[in-house]
């Protein structure tokens, strides 16, 4: 049997097991007999530390609390901001009614853990009857980027100060893994920056880079060859476009450079759009692997999907990736406490495995050694959080997996009030970023326009 056919057989078994777990969760949730009696929706405007390049100085979030008639409260991040519509959809219904799965989002997982009286990761670890250990803490990669000053003129990170800034967050939080967001400058400037940062942090700190699929294949190859001596952990999808183009470029670059490539789009397919079950809905369990693409390309060394796919979908995805000998990671979007918590729970039960002491010859389905990577996170860049106790604390660059039932975190009413969204606050941030965008190409030293031609400078 060829390797892809073997993978397909293994994947069918994995999906069958995941669907059996999904059905058990659904049955246990419905049998608990809860009814949603109240829904509270909160809009929040959370500032970044500094201003995230020309993107913005704050981000808008929507949270919801779903309270049941038995006194449990499930929390969701990324909820429907239309409180009236959300209440109309869910009030009076069982939170595990399949018709409202998309409305529940993250709260679905928070509530099932609370009903089971288990931290979510432990609950899922038990349902899958895993023999591998359950992690108590998860290594995090510190996301970094060029920062313009915030509204108070503070917390800038420039090309010149970037290496000392990285040294500072390593000293403060113990990070052992740094991620460089790399669409702020033109590609050639990043060669110098990576060399400077590697010299500043030494050889013990892992460095990964992400051009956000903003480069051409030739640009990516030139960069990769010039920084090979820096021993990067990975470069994430340097080339964009249609998935077929991303996969083809990744495949070619892997043959031309020793730097590993990470992808959150490989293995295909991963997520269906739009997702009928909403965020964390595990829709990808119903999508078959693209066997033609798997036979045609090998575009990545590390598979790092988004947690939005759902815990069961990621379990399936990671098992398939490891079957093919890929490393595994987890991509980051913009997450505050509740969404960070589920990422920690997913990593805690899906990532760990027992490394063999000796080489294993011919053993079926033996996972490759050293395949688990620190997970991406924007979390270190937020000014605060809206969970009780504030931001989770880093310890040697790790975050502890929350120990309470469900997600193990709760929303803090005071912080929700302090960071409540208002048009006035949003307008101030909008004015600030518009001023930056008017001059950002000059500030960042760009020689070309965003369209690619040399800049025409008016006299």
Regions found by a protein language model. Give the residues of each.
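N-terminal capping/lid subdomain adjacent to the active-site entrance of alpha/beta enzymes
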Residues: 2-208, 212-221, 225-229, 256, ...
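Right-handed parallel beta-helix/beta-solenoid
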Residues: 216, 242-243
């Amino acid at each position: 049997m060829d390797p892809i056919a073997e993978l397909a057989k293994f994947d069918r078994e994995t999906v069958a097991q995941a669907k059996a777990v999904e059905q058990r969760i659904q049955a246990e949730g419905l049998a608990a007999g809860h009814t949603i009696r109240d829904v509270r929706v909160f809009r929040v405007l959370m500032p970044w530390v500094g201003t995230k390049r020309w993107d913005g100085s704050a981000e808008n979030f929507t949270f919801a609390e779903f309270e049941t008639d038995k006194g449990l409260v499930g929390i969701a991040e990324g909820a429907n901001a239309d409180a009236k519509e959300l209440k109309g959809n869910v009030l009076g219904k069982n939170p595990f009614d399949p018709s409202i799965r998309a409305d529940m989002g993250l709260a679905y997982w928070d509530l099932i853990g609370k009903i089971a009286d288990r931290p979510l990761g432990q609950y899922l670890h038990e349902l899958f009857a895993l023999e591998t250990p359950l992690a108590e803490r998860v290594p995090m990669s510190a996301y970094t980027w060029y920062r313009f000053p915030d509204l108070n003129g503070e917390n800038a990170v420039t090309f010149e100060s970037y290496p000392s800034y990285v040294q500072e967050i390593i000293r403060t939080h113990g990070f052992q893994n740094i991620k460089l967001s790399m669409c702020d400058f033109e590609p050639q400037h990043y060669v110098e920056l990576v060399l400077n940062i590697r010299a500043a942090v030494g050889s013990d700190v892992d460095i990964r880079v992400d051009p956000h699929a903003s480069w051409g294949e030739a640009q990516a190859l030139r960069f990769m060859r010039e920084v090979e001596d820096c021993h990067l952990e990975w470069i994430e999808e340097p080339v964009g476009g249609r998935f077929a183009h991303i996969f083809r470029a990744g495949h070619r670059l892997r043959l031309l450079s020793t730097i590993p490539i990470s992808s959150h789009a490989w293995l295909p397919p991963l997520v269906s759009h739009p997702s009928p079950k909403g965020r964390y809905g595990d829709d990808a369990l119903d999508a078959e692997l693209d066997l033609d693409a798997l036979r045609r390309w090998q575009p990545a060394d590390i598979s790092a999907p988004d947690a939005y796919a759902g815990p069961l979908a990621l379990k399936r995805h990671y098992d398939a990736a490891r079957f093919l000998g890929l490393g595994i990671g987890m991509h980051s979007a913009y997450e505050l406490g509740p969404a960070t918590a589920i990422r920690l729970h997913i990593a805690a039960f899906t990532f760990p495995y027992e490394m063999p002491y000796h080489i294993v010859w011919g053993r079926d389905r033996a996972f490759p050694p050293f395949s688990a990577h620190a997970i991406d996170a924007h979390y270190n860049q937020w000014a605060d959080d809206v969970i009780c106790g504030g931001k989770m604390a880093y310890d040697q660059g790790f975050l502890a997996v929350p120990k309470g039932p469900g997600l193990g975190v709760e929303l803090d009413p005071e912080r929700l009030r302090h960071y409540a969204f208002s048009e006035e606050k949003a307008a101030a941030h909008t004015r600030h970023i518009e001023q930056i965008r008017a001059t950002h190409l000059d500030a960042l030293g760009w020689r070309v326009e965003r369209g690619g031609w040399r800049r025409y400078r008016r006299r």
